[in-house]
Amino acid sequence: MFNARRLIAATLLMSCAFGAHAERLKDIASISGVRANQLIGYGLVVGLNGTGDQTTQTPFTLQTFNNMLSQFGIKVPPGSGNVQLKNVAAVSVHADLPPFAKPGQVVDITVSSIGNSKSLRGGSLLMTPLKGIDGNVYAIAQGNLVVGGFDAEGRDGSKITVNVPSAGRIPGGASVERAVPSGFNQGNSLTLNLNRPDFTTAKRIVDKVNELLGPGVAQAVDGGSVRVTAPMDPSQRVDYLSILENLEIDPGQAVAKVIINSRTGTIVIGQNVKVSPAAVTHGSLTVTITEDPIVSQPGPFSNGQTAVVPRSRVNAQQEAKPMFKFGPGTTLDEIVRAVNQVGAAPSDLMAILEALKQAGALQADLIVI
């Protein structure tokens, strides 16, 4: 059973709980059930300077506009289906509802065109309900857009586009109308979920909490979760968590990984990557094809025709690459230095790392994204 004396004693012990290279518990774990919720809505942006949807190609924009007018008692005359609304665009609106958000608070929203609008710059979002996955309305969005890009087009068809003008944001553009139920104050325990599951980190969290608050307060569920006993009183529970989230924990070392992005040529090598003894050589074959066409000119009065005769030259060159050797326990710095000495390009380094992994010499997970 928790009481005020135990919380005060734990607070006084916090000054002794800081490590040299530790991280706060709030930075490596989250409380189960305390999370953001996604909201989405559909609406109209008006006031555009001729950059709205072409309603002949996006009929849903005109349909939405007519439905809005009907709510104000305005009837669109029959036969006006081909009207062009150059300053209106159909958009999707989404936002993240933070945990513990209460009615009356505001959240930021993102507005994105779903038609063929060229730009949302200068537009205003009309009142749009934002719903959760359960279909209930949790917020109402409205306001003027902030767009970071722009689009300009000349009469001859030339155009310039900077960033993405078809999406924008409205800071504080949605007002919360309904709170999301939370199980934060239910039960006599809370579960801490590690952002990066690790058995060593989970054990160190349990040891640190039990050292501070007493044996048996924290128990490891698995490598990614730790269950801690918590006071039932909401006020004491908040004080209790403020102590826990500021505990300094020394996390376990991450698994050695090499990340390769084959599309961009980006390679990230983790600090704990090591290579077993291996010898590597990587040569490259360069094939050059040049086209040097010649013109065949017939002699005078020969009734011949001038013709272009193609002439291709193919040259193959094999570059000699030196062999370099990795000793036992080679570190990241030594790998990078050895590869740079032979002038390997990112594509060459990818091939070398993949070959080392296949040979069993790369002591790390090789992940291609």
UniProtKB/Swiss-Prot annotation:
Keywords: Bacterial flagellum, Periplasm, Signal. InterPro entries: Flag_FlgI (IPR001782). The keyword Transport does not apply. Its main location: periplasm. It comes from the Bacteria. GO terms for molecular function: structural molecule activity. The basal body constitutes a major portion of the flagellar organelle and consists of four rings (L,P,S, and M) mounted on a central rod. One of its GO terms (biological process) is bacterial-type flagellum-dependent cell motility. This is Flagellar P-ring protein. One of its GO terms (cellular component) is bacterial-type flagellum basal body, distal rod, P ring. Residues 1-22 form the signal peptide. Pfam families: FlgI. Belongs to the FlgI family. Assembles around the rod to form the L-ring and probably protects the motor/basal body from shearing forces during rotation. The keyword Amino-acid biosynthesis does not apply. It is found in: Periplasm; Bacterial flagellum basal body.
